[in-house]
Structure formats: structure tokens, C-alpha cells
């Protein structure tokens, strides 16, 4: 075992610490259920630090058996909408035909009535300007 989760508070603080790192731009699949997290706290820090939270398509694939992934990602979308915080979609492609496959995400987008302008995948210029500046090494 390479990682052992902690409490919801410990897990959330660990992710927040990563988000405050100037070299971290995106937190990948926080909603997949691997760790219990406080999504509202993460969304607030996402807005503050310009660290994007990824909505991960593959974590919701039936073959993954991650039953909390869809409700967690729906909650993330609802919070992003509430706080007007951009997100990024990830296909997490495990095969070439799965690249840019958002088929598990789109029903959640519709259910949340999530605004397209908060999806940075569709706006490369906005994506690049949204990223926080990376310090020189």
C-alpha cells in the first residue's frame, strides 16, 4: 500500500496543502472516492489559488465500481457553479479511443445546469491565463 487515507479533515488538509503549492496547477479526480474530502473547502481554495479541480470521466465508468464518483462529481460541479469557479474535465483515457470522452460527465453537467464558460477545456486561452504563475526554479 503506497497511500493510507486519513480522516476527512486530514485528507482535505493534505489536498489544500498541495493546492497552495505554487507548482501544483490541477488536482486530478478528487471526486473518485479514493479519499473522503470536504468538497466545499476544496472549491473555495480552488477559487482562491487558481488550482483547478478535475472532473474525471473514467472514475465514473461502470467497470471502475466507484459508486460515489458520480454523486461526488455532481457535488463538485454544483459547488463550482455556486462559487463561479472553473473546472477542467479529464477523460483519464486508458485507451486511445477514450481520449476526450466525457460521456460520463455530460449527464452531470446537464443535471447541474453547469455553465459552459466554467469548463476550461473549451477555452484554451482562458485556461492558460487562469493558471497561476509558476515560480522560477
Per-segment meaning from a language model:
Residues 34, 60-61, 95, 124:
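Positions that flank functional sites
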Residues 3, 30, 64-65, 93:
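Conserved short-loop catalytic and cofactor-binding motifs
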Residues 94-96, 113-127:
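C-terminal domain-boundary segment and adjacent tail
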Amino acid at each position: 500500500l503506497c497511500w493510507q487515507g486519513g480522516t476527512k479533515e486530514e485528507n482535505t488538509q493534505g489536498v489544500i496543502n498541495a493546492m497552495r503549492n505554487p507548482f501544483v496547477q490541477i488536482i486530478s479526480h478528487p471526486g473518485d472516492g479514493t479519499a473522503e474530502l470536504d468538497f466545499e473547502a476544496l472549491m473555495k481554495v480552488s477559487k482562491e489559488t487558481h488550482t483547478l479541480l478535475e472532473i474525471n470521466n473514467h472514475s465514473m465508468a461502470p467497470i471502475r465500481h466507484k459508486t460515489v464518483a458520480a454523486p461526488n462529481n455532481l457535488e463538485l460541479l454544483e459547488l463550482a457553479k455556486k462559487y463561479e469557479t472553473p473546472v477542467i474535465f479529464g477523460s483519464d483515457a486508458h485507451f486511445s479511443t477514450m481520449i476526450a470522452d466525457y460521456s460520463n460527465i455530460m449527464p452531470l453537467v446537464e443535471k447541474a445546469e453547469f455553465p459552459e464558460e466554467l469548463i476550461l477545456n473549451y477555452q484554451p486561452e482562458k485556461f492558460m491565463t487562469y493558471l497561476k504563475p509558476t515560480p522560477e526554479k
